[in-house]
Amino acid sequence: MSADPIGPYSPWVEAGEWVVTSGQIGLVDNVMVDGLGPQCDAALSNLGLRLAEAGLKPTDVMKTTVFMVSMDDYGVINEHYVAFFGAHRPARSAVAVSALPAGALMEIEAWAYRPVVDSERQEAVL
């Protein structure tokens, strides 16, 4: 599965203890998959890839923003979102928009927290 950026932006950046992902859409091998459910799964899988690249996992996500082309899709998106995050519940905003890149039906971006470890104490500094 590919999650290569389709524009002039970084797939994720870090600033101190924070990692911020760009929006992830339902591309597989740079081709948009058909249907809302498969797009949700692909976008969330791409998000997981971005988190893993940064050494993080879904439970490190503190905030997401979900964009959708129809608020009628909210319930279906929630089902796939819960399947990805499990019991973890990041803060979230959900926004209906008129269109998304590459014909996407939904897009998700995330803010994840990675505590700085104090090397002398070998524990997270919170």
Residue ranges and their predicted role:
Residues 1-126:
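Short, polar/acidic, helix-capping and beta-turn segments at strand->helix junctions
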